[in-house]
Amino acid sequence: MKRLLCVLLAGLMAMSLFACGKKAAPEQSGDPVAQSSITALQYSDDNVLVRFTRVDDTWKWADGLDFPLDDTFVLQLEKEVGALLQAESIGMIEDAATYGFDNAQKYIAVTNQDKTVRLSFGKQNAEGKWYMTRDDQPDAAYLADDQLVQKLSTSIYDMALLPTLPAFTQENLCTVTLDQEEGLHLHLTAKDGEWTASGKKVKADDLQKELENLTVTKCVDYHPTAGAISLCGFDTPLSVTVSYANSVGSMSDWVLKIGGEAIDGEGFYVTVGEDSTIYEMPKDHLTSVLQLAADNRQELSVDDAELEENN
């Protein structure tokens, strides 16, 4: 009996010594920042920094509260971060460099009224997940999905609500006027599916179709600076004024200003109506307008040359 007791005691002592030799991950005892209490959220991938604040239970861009934000992305990110805050640790951090925490550039920070928790992301493991640490539990390591971490490269302009353009049809189109400071002025009148200028028929077969399908594909710059306006080609923009009968039957003028070619090569920079925001419009939505402008400028330059020769 004594011998059996000794064996049991020895086993218990060995288990105790083994346990003492390992660090245990901290237990989760309720998260200090619950999803329902988040009042601010920001993220960065070291190239972009985007900050949001909750105003009257609605998410706003912290650096422009009047920005036309589609908060679908923010709500999804908030949900994913809320789940991540409840994740269990995978163990204690023995060496920060092993996990990439010594130079972590990607992070999400969430705030309630009293506390901010920052989640920093280090390296990816063999399965493609990212090691994560929390500043309120700096000794513990966690794992985060790659899908979430990739979202940290999302620009605020990717979340912009794009403007709804007027619905132009053959029935409501009246006139289209092209103006540019370089001596361009072309006034087109629509009648029975044809276009005329100064009483003469103008070849513009696809103009109506293009006007019916106008759309902007992305927001490029909100409240642009003078430098950005110039860089995007709006020093001497091509102005397109469309007069049409609106939904209540009265006449309205809608103005589209076309700047330079977009850096991605897929469209042109434009502004819509009185809004100074710069958007991008696909090239194939502007083919007829740009061709009419080019042809008219060419005719003007020929006339000018002939006038100079006669003088």
Task: Label every model-predicted segment.
Residues G21-N311:
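A short-motif feature that recognizes glycine-rich, charge-decorated loops
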